[in-house]
């Protein structure tokens, strides 16, 4: 399977890139600049592509992103602190983001004669993001089968769609993913904040996987409070 991986530079997509490079044929990484405040993640995608010796392309869709207003990831809206599964995290939804990126990726994959587009959506995303759920993945595959009928037969490869973040950490370790060379924090500062939903989820995932977290957090202990508050 010749696969094009959508890679943000985050833990999930970098782990997926290493998985595909080991198990299949990785033909390249595709990233998107949609005006996200944590744009520094794109640099980690570039590092991953260089490490795996594959082409890396960043697609500029900032004009599109400017029209998807109201999200804490793109607008002047505070990124909330707390657990990823809290209702407050819905402010991080960028409407139709994955659908837009996947549609572009399928077009690129078809032009490059690839067999698959790989995406790292996972089970932990289901609560907040509708375009990360299994039903969406299945529906998008059906739509692309019609969109490319007679031209290309491309599979949407989403191996993590029913896996937890901890599962991805465990599998990423198996494929020697350099977790320190990935970026998760939505606030986009010099260091991982340790308080936003993605930082809390990241720290919790390493703990559940029983693997040492190499990440440098500004607040390394907040995740415990976030988990306790959610469980209360």
UniProtKB/Swiss-Prot annotation:
<keyword id="KW-0671">Queuosine biosynthesis</keyword>
<dbReference type="Pfam" id="PF06508">
    <property type="entry name" value="QueC"/>
</dbReference>
<dbReference type="GO" id="GO:0005524">
    <property type="term" value="F:ATP binding"/>
</dbReference>
<comment type="pathway">
    <text>Purine metabolism; 7-cyano-7-deazaguanine biosynthesis.</text>
</comment>
<dbReference type="GO" id="GO:0008270">
    <property type="term" value="F:zinc ion binding"/>
</dbReference>
<feature type="binding site">
    <location>
        <position position="185"/>
    </location>
    <ligand>
        <name>Zn(2+)</name>
    </ligand>
</feature>
<feature type="binding site">
    <location>
        <begin position="7"/>
        <end position="17"/>
    </location>
    <ligand>
        <name>ATP</name>
    </ligand>
</feature>
<dbReference type="GO" id="GO:0008616">
    <property type="term" value="P:queuosine biosynthetic process"/>
</dbReference>
<dbReference type="GO" id="GO:0016879">
    <property type="term" value="F:ligase activity, forming carbon-nitrogen bonds"/>
</dbReference>
<protein>
    <recommendedName>
        <fullName>7-cyano-7-deazaguanine synthase 1</fullName>
        <ecNumber>6.3.4.20</ecNumber>
    </recommendedName>
</protein>
<keyword id="KW-0862">Zinc</keyword>
<feature type="binding site">
    <location>
        <position position="199"/>
    </location>
    <ligand>
        <name>Zn(2+)</name>
    </ligand>
</feature>
<comment type="function">
    <text>Catalyzes the ATP-dependent conversion of 7-carboxy-7-deazaguanine (CDG) to 7-cyano-7-deazaguanine (preQ(0)).</text>
</comment>
<keyword id="KW-0436">Ligase</keyword>
<keyword id="KW-0479">Metal-binding</keyword>
<keyword id="KW-0547">Nucleotide-binding</keyword>
<comment type="similarity">
    <text>Belongs to the QueC family.</text>
</comment>
<feature type="binding site">
    <location>
        <position position="193"/>
    </location>
    <ligand>
        <name>Zn(2+)</name>
    </ligand>
</feature>
<feature type="binding site">
    <location>
        <position position="196"/>
    </location>
    <ligand>
        <name>Zn(2+)</name>
    </ligand>
</feature>
<dbReference type="InterPro" id="IPR014729">
    <property type="entry name" value="Rossmann-like_a/b/a_fold"/>
</dbReference>
<keyword id="KW-0067">ATP-binding</keyword>
<dbReference type="InterPro" id="IPR018317">
    <property type="entry name" value="QueC"/>
</dbReference>
